[in-house]
Amino acid sequence: MNTQQLAKLRSIVPEMRRVRHIHFVGIGGAGMGGIAEVLANEGYQISGSDLAPNPVTQQLMNLGATIYFNHRPENVRDASVVVVSSAISADNPEIVAAHEARIPVIRRAEMLAELMRFRHGIAIAGTHGKTTTTAMVSSIYAEAGLDPTFVNGGLVKAAGVHARLGHGRYLIAEADESDASFLHLQPMVAIVTNIEADHMDTYQGDFENLKQTFINFLHNLPFYGRAVMCVDDPVIRELLPRVGRQTTTYGFSEDADVRVEDYQQIGPQGHFTLLRQDKEPMHVTLNAPGRHNALNAAAAVAVATEEGIDDEAILRALESFQGTGRRFDFLGEFPLEPVNGKSGTAMLVDDYGHHPTEVDATIKAARAGWPDKNLVMLFQPHRFTRTRDLYDDFANVLTQVDTLLMLEVYPAGEAPIPGADSRSLCRTIRGRGKIDPILVPDPAQVAEMLAPVLTGNDLILVQGAGNIGKIARSLAEIKLKPQTPEEEQHD
């Protein structure tokens, strides 16, 4: 660390000046990697470990970080602090070694809280829409010339990174409720997009516990802070009297402080009007499809309006919004082999949504923007517990597509649960008589099993949170065409 870097570091986070070397266990995750990237740009020595390289680790290596693709005790040698992902178990050899060496071990949200401590923090929480809303707020603040720091759970496509160190006073961050670690954050402004039952193992299966945790998060706001909340969500509407802070509501509801009306989707863009108190109506063109994204934009506009950002900057940012990685991510439109003598094309869209509400929103956006397309979904359930807990909801939502192909459940470290597997879910959906799902037992067979169901006027949604994003990219690389054994060997 040179003198100039150290001076910059001290000016931004003076109380951390004794920290030199920060080690991340599970550094390849988007949330972990984003924080590591900001700290690397602040001048800290960064190291980290994960099981395999990915774009996040490559970006960090480009910034000078040392990355180990293993978990060994010696990796934490000389670290001032060890930051651990919630996916890492307590018996990880690096965690054990850190404790034995009396090196502090903290969760990622604690480090994010330290970054936020010396800035004007804007935290975006909620079951769905956090990543996109974080990107929208960041885009608006950047367009307004405020040069924010942001830390997002997904790739901000306009910036090409998950996180960026700005020189302005704002830090805009996605706040993760999955392990309740967002309670470490103390922002000035908090957005809550919605609250549904998810990650219930963290909350002992008690929805009241989850709701109270969100209230506790909002009570971390100072008394002069502001909560921005979607009043369309019934749980948020129920909780509003308990917030105890200044609030701004948004939604399609007539009593929303920032109200969406006259929504219309044309292809990938949403067009709508935002009505705000004591402001002229704002006529928005949003470069993101779906009513759910109009709500995300309304949240971002509510925050920006409160900050006094010019309407023109807001409108420019939303119209040019490039989205986030794996959120209705358009990967291309590819020509197909002639079907019944007629040639055609198929659009390929990759989406991270893995909760029934998210899948439903993606399907509705696809139907609204491309109503004449044959809608084909390749779905990978994520976690056996989620599949079990939301089984009927998944079965109901997935019947809305024209053709469904389903991969095996991505376990995310969980043991199988009888009846919460893809074969059972396919059987249940088939029994409802609307569609006949196709189980894909081997990901290598996806292109081969996809080809016969395409009509030449298709929109393919690749949906899920496991390793299905890699499958989507491989489909784009081969332009949806099944590979011969010779081609596979050549690849």
Curated annotation (Swiss-Prot):
One of its GO terms (molecular function) is ATP binding. It comes from the Bacteria. GO terms for cellular component: cytoplasm. Its EC number is 6.3.2.8. ATP binds at residues 126-132. GO terms for biological process: cell division; cell wall organization; peptidoglycan biosynthetic process; regulation of cell shape. Pathway: Cell wall biogenesis; peptidoglycan biosynthesis. It catalyses: UDP-N-acetyl-alpha-D-muramate + L-alanine + ATP = UDP-N-acetyl-alpha-D-muramoyl-L-alanine + ADP + phosphate + H(+). Transmembrane segments: none annotated. It is found in: Cytoplasm. SUPFAM superfamilies: MurCD N-terminal domain, MurD-like peptide ligases, catalytic domain, MurD-like peptide ligases, peptide-binding domain. HAMAP family: MurC (MF_00046). Cell wall formation. Belongs to the MurCDEF family. NCBIfam families: murC (TIGR01082). This is UDP-N-acetylmuramate--L-alanine ligase. It comes from Escherichia coli O6:K15:H31 (strain 536 / UPEC).
